[in-house]
Amino acid sequence: MEYTVSYLLVLFLIGAIGSILSGMVGIGGSVIKYPMLLYIPPLLGFVAFTAQEVAAISAVQVFFSTLAALVVFKKGGYVSFRLVGYMGTAIVIGSFIGGYGSKFLADETINFVYAILASIAAILMFFPKPKGSEEVSAEQLAFNRLYAVVLSFIVGVASGIVGAAGAFIIVPIMLVILKVPTRIAIGSSVAITFISSIGATVGKIMGGHMLLVPSIVMVIASLLAAPIGAKLSQKINTKVLEYILLVLIVATVIKIWYEMLT
């Protein structure tokens, strides 16, 4: 595949825009960048990527964008490592089980499981958050460990079944059910997504679907843009962050149901 300067610029902008948004609201970015990579290049007259190539590029990009954003959130004190330990471990174990078990399920069942879970995440975002929860620090954070482990395990299984990240589902669970402050939920979600992206990145590289040049461009964009999104996240009003997250989740849910029903 031949890469012109304009093509590489388009890829860089896709990576930068997606990384800023994902850094702001604590999702890995594949939810945003996957459709952008799949549809924008051919719309502009460039050669289209295959779904496998897009998934591979997204996996590598998510790894580096979450790593870059995590550094910023950690400095700001918005990462609860206890929360990350419980939920990160459960979601990784769940994703392995879901990934293996998916071969026993029909495609329709796989899509339905994820559509239902994503819809629940969207509904959760409409629930009011408890007052005063934003004042708790990451060190003082108390949460129901059983709920954290069980719910993140379920998300991990569903994510593994579908082969997609579950960060956009984890954040609403943290906000509404575990009552985690918005900025800590976002920072901790970035850490969890980073952990869960390691396996996906290694798998895609070993699978031979990696395109070196686009991946490098997207990684550079991520390393530059994700910290910007993370810094913006610490300055923007938490309500605005929740609205941005809500829009992204609802758009994802609509896309999932549309693809399943058409």
Predicted segments, located by residue:
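Juxtamembrane transmembrane-helix boundary motif
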Residues: 1-23, 32-45, 52, 68-158, ...
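Hydrophobic, membrane-facing alpha-helical anchors
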Residues: 6, 10-14, 59-69, 165-171, ...
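Transmembrane helix boundary and interhelical junction motifs in multipass membrane proteins
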Residues: 25-34, 163-173
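Interfacial helix-start motif at the membrane-water boundary
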Residues: 51-58
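Short hydrophobic/aromatic, small-residue-rich stretches within specific transmembrane helices
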Residues: 58-62, 189-193, 214-219
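Aromatic-anchored, glycine/proline-accented short structural segments
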Residues: 169-191
